[in-house]
Amino acid sequence: MHRSHPSISRRKHLMKEMMEDDYALPTETQQIARVISSRGNNLHEVETVDETFLVSMPNKFRKSMWVKRGDFLLVEPIEEGDKVKAEICKILTPEHIKEYTKAAIWPDKFTKKPVQEEATSQNKDDSDFEDDLLPNTNRPVNRDSSDEEEDEETSSEED
């Protein structure tokens, strides 16, 4: 008889739980938070609408679910912590965000800017960034086509 590794079955059950989620709305005590950074030891710095604090990853998520900067979480406050003020209840997926937005409980602070605004601000940033770049000394400098035409004219005059 073949037995699967315990962490594999735990991960499988967590993934199944996430997929079969009913997208229940947060309770009164739960908050929506965005991950700012990972602090190690299953601690993550998050921001909510009002404040920034640390949250802990519960044992059931450890080594099977990962969060990265910018991910959204549902957190529940814990009483025993000074620095660590909450524990992760749920890692929110784009489907959760869509449902929470429909229910009008998604914080305005976390609403994305319209695509057009992002593109124009990004283009401004890109052009500023390119202006600050030093020339690449590993490649020959491209000459303008107008310089080449002048060279051709001078060479034909010499003949």
From Swiss-Prot:
One of its GO terms (molecular function) is translation initiation factor activity. Residues 146-159 have a biased composition (Acidic residues). Residues 109-159 are annotated as: Disordered. InterPro entries: EIF1AD, NA-bd_OB-fold, RNA-binding_domain_S1_IF1, TIF_eIF-1A. Keywords: RNA-binding. It comes from the Eukaryota. SMART domains: eIF1a. Residues 18-93 form the S1-like domain. It holds the Pfam family eIF-1a. One of its GO terms (cellular component) is nucleus. Belongs to the EIF1AD family. PANTHER family: RNA-BINDING PROTEIN EIF1AD-RELATED, TRANSLATION INITIATION FACTOR-RELATED. This is Probable RNA-binding protein EIF1AD.
